[in-house]
């Protein structure tokens, strides 16, 4: 992990603020929550480590993603807004970062059941129609003149595409599965109780929201500006916006552009495993003037895929700004200061970009 050197939740800005950023009664509650989060977040990370999601060579999420999303949350929230969040809001953000993608984890019985699901068979057939390169690989594998090395390479590529297809299927319901997991696993866990209220339901709603339109973060869908937990008021709309943007800013790996899948065939130098490496961000600049990335892209297809991510981030930035702009007057402290869309790198940086391109590193702005 080249940029955010995070080994545990204790290294994140949000947890440090929860642990040490309060006084009086708030400090007592905050420190209890911070202590509870150590074990809870470790459980979330262990679950990601223990179950390679879809294929041992293509694990969809890992504990690194959870920690990075947690830290990116602190980067997208203005610093004075962050220090003004109450202990429950900080806790909800940390928990949602750690549980929003738990639905991508398939345990063995679930995977076996899914493979026999008629809906999955239909999905697979349609996916192969839309991705003729997969069918072409199958035909090539039937060639008896192939060398063993060539056959092994084709099998590897086929496995990558099969994992991508399965990922696409699971992705459709992973937010609901994440919410269900939180409710079932932690709905009666006393570590999740604050002032007599178990906050698993609030975390479940946030998990569910991150895969839906940002404009569904509305009171009628369970997202209020003044959700009450004991004497604390929680802005669930703001928490939902922060989660979804931090998630995609980690180049969330279940959002690999479909166009990249279509480029993979038996002659291609494109590999999903290689894309996984290149997807890793080498540097961020995130402030009110600029959201800028530096990624390592050694193939035009990886650059094209990365630029698609920039387009997604632009849409999320615009949606978030629009929603926050409509907050009631009493909630104006929850500001959003990130730029609305991509901005060009200044001229000197553009010259640097050309130099970096020659060495295989591409800065992107989004």
Tell where the protein language model's regions lie, with residue ranges.
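C-terminal effector/catalytic modules and regulatory tails appended to multi-domain proteins
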Residues: 1-22, 26-41, 225-366
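Acidic/His-rich, divalent-metal-binding segments that scaffold phosphate/diphosphate chemistry
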Residues: 2-110, 114-156, 160, 349-366
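Zn2+-dependent metallopeptidase catalytic core
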Residues: 64-79, 181-184, 188, 312-326
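Divalent metal-dependent catalytic cores for phosphoryl transfer on phosphate-bearing substrates
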Residues: 83-286
């Amino acid at each position: 992990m080249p940029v955010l050197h995070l080994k545990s939740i204790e290294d994140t800005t949000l947890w440090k603020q929860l642990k040490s950023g309060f006084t009086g009664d708030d400090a007592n509650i905050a420190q209890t929550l911070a202590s509870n989060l150590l074990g809870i977040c470790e459980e979330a990370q262990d679950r990601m480590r223990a179950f390679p999601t879809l294929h041992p060579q293509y694990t969809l999420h890992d504990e690194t993603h959870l920690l990075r999303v947690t830290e990116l949350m602190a980067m997208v929230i203005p610093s004075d807004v962050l220090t003004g969040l109450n202990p429950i809001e900080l806790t909800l953000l940390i928990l949602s970062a750690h549980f929003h993608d738990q639905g991508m984890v398939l345990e063995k019985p679930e995977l076996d059941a899914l493979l026999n699901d008629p809906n999955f068979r239909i999905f697979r057939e349609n996916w192969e129609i839309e991705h003729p390169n997969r069918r072409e690989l199958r035909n090539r594998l039937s060639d008896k003149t192939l060398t063993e090395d060539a056959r092994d390479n084709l099998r590897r590529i086929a496995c990558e595409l099969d994992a991508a297809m399965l990922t696409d299927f699971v992705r459709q319901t992973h937010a609901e599965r994440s919410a269900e997991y939180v409710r079932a696993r932690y709905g009666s866990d006393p570590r999740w109780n604050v002032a007599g209220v178990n906050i698993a339901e609030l975390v479940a709603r946030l998990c569910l929201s991150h895969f839906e339109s940002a404009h569904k973060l509305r009171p009628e869908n369970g997202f209020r500006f003044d959700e009450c937990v004991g004497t604390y008021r929680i802005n669930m709309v703001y928490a939902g916006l922060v989660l979804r943007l931090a998630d995609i800013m980690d180049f969330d790996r279940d959002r690999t552009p479909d166009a990249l899948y279509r480029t993979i065939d038996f002659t291609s130098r494109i590999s999903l495993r290689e894309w996984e490496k290149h997807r890793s961000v080498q540097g961020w600049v995130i402030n009110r003037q600029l959201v800028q990335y530096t990624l390592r892209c050694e193939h035009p297809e990886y650059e094209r895929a990365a630029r698609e991510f920039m387009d997604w981030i632009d849409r999320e930035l615009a949606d978030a700004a629009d929603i926050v702009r409509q907050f009631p007057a009493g909630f104006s402290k929850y500001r959003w200061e990130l730029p609305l869309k991509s901005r060009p790198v200044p001229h000197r940086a553009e010259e640097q970009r050309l130099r970096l391109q020659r060495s295989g590193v591409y800065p992107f702005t989004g």
